[in-house]
Amino acid sequence: LSQYGAVADAIKKFNYDYGLFLARLGYVVLCPDARGIGERRDEAFQKDEEEMFLRSTCFYLAHMAEPLGMTVAGMCTWDLMRLIDYAEERGQWRTDNLGCLGFSGGGMQTLWLAALDDRVKMAVISGYMYGYKDALLKLNGNCSCNYVPGLWKYYDCGDIGSLIAPRPLLIQSCAEDHLNGERGIANADEQVEIIRQAYRLFGAKNKLIHQHCPGGHQFHKEGIKENLERMEEML
C-alpha cells in the first residue's frame, strides 16, 4: 500500500508500520485487518478511492450492530480471539508468550483483547488510554468502534486496563494528542493511575510502564525495543 501517496503519508505521520518494525526486531507478527478497516472496509459506502484506504466504515457496522445488542469493539475482540486460536492450531510458533501491540484503534483492540483473554501475556497500548468523559463524550468525531452503550456510567478505560494486571503492560501517551481532550495528558495519567492501583494490589507495580511521548497522536518507536526486552524478562 505504500505505493499510494495518501497511505505513505499516513504511515510516515503516524508510524503505522509498527508491524514491520516488530518483524525487523525478530518477532513473528500477525497484522489482521479489523472489521471496517483495510480490505474489510465496506466499499459500497466508501468506493475505492485512494484517500479512503485508511478510513473506516465502522459507523455502518455500529449502526447495524448496536440495535442487535452488539458492538464493533466486541466483534473486533472476538476476531482477535479467533486469531489466537489460529496461531495455536497452526502449531508453527510458540504461543505461551503471546503479546499484543496496537496504536489508536489498534490500542483499543489491544486493551479489550488483553483484558478479556489471558492468553495475551504482555501488551502495548499506544494512543488509547483516555477517560471516556473527556475523550468520547465531550469530543465529537471519534470512530464508532469506540462506543459501548452505557459503559461510561459504570466503568472507565482504566478499569478495563486493570484486568490486564499483573501481566506486563506498556502504555504510550502523547503530550499533544488531541484525543486526550480539553485537560490534556492529565486525562491519560488519571486512567493509568487506576491501572497502577491494580498492579500494586498484585505486588507487580514494576510490570506497568507509562511512557510520556512528545507530539500529537502517533505511535513512538523510541524505547520500544528496550521496553519489550524488559517486559519479556518479566514473563
Label every model-predicted segment:
Residues V72, S104-G107:
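Active-site loop->helix "elbow" adjoining a glycine-rich segment at hydrolase catalytic centers
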Residues F59-P67, R82, V120-S162, P166, ...:
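Mobile cap/lid helix-loop segments that gate and shape the active-site cleft of serine hydrolases
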Residues L80, G107-D118:
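Short glycine-enriched nucleophile-adjacent loop
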Residues E193-L235:
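C-terminal catalytic histidine-bearing segment of alpha/beta-hydrolase fold enzymes
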Residues L101, S126-G127, Q172, C213:
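Alpha/beta-hydrolase-fold catalytic nucleophile elbow
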Residues I164, I171-S173:
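Short beta-strand/loop motif that positions the catalytic acidic residue
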Residues Q92-S104:
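Alpha/beta-hydrolase fold nucleophile elbow
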Residues L1-W78, E89, D134-K138:
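Cap/lid segment of the alpha/beta-hydrolase catalytic domain
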